[in-house]
Amino acid sequence: MTGDPPVRRRLVGGALRRYREAIGYMLEDAARILECDRSKISRIETGQRGIRPKELRELLTEYGVPAGEQSALVAIAGRGGRSSWWHSYPGIVTDTYLDYAIMESAASEIMAYEAQLVPDLLQTDEYTGAIAAAEPGDRTGQQRDDAVAAQAARRQAVLGGGRRIGVVLGEGALHQAVGGAGVLAGQIGHLVKLSAECPALTIQVLPFSAGAHAAAGAGSLAILRFPDAPGLGVAHLGAVSGGVYLESQDDVSRYLRAFALLRASALSPADSDRMLRGLAR
């Protein structure tokens, strides 16, 4: 049995289908634009095959899709420029990881919730290394070091990109002694520093006192939204290297509502900062 098509293909293909249907085009009409048979269009729309940037632009232009939305889809469908951080870590970045990395780099807004761990984008190298060392498997010390370096490159690229990032962090993550007390203390201090230095980053702590909440039972949630493309989005449950992707508009809307409820249940950014500073002392 074959697996599901890659999430980036599903996201782009689903968008193409919606745009085509919105203007009343049939598969045959789209096929005439690319001078191909209708089966190729069908496979593209269902994510069974990819599409070249030139062909993607041709379809999007014919469908009347605004330029900003076109650019977002082309970025999602591509593999990034030569300077993209993931090209330096081919042995670490799996196909699944690459899908997420490319979508993350194209996103204009990232929303993340973690119950027990500090999210990847906010971790120190020491914290990341402690997690890597605890994972099952037979990775060598060098491979773990490379994984930490890849994560650091990813953080630098994403945090330095000016995109909005909203994080809701379970209070338990501030007490889970990943790597020991010293590593945890350094990690909390790093959160305080990031909060002060990154104006596009908002950190909120979901306190133990919040009780049951909109993400109860979910350990990890990330939502990506894209510039000038209100109909595009991806919700991801689980680790970057695996997990489940949901890209339908209904699913993304449901998780956006859940994240809004999480934010409402969490401490305000100011109160969260005070908690972090108190723990960092």
Region annotations inferred by a language model:
Residues 2-18, 22, 28-32, 46, ...:
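Interdomain hinge/linker segments and adjacent boundary elements that couple functional modules
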Residues 180-281:
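C-terminal regulatory/effector modules of DNA-binding transcriptional regulators
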Residues 25, 36-37:
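The short coil/loop that forms the "turn" connecting the two helices of the helix-turn-helix
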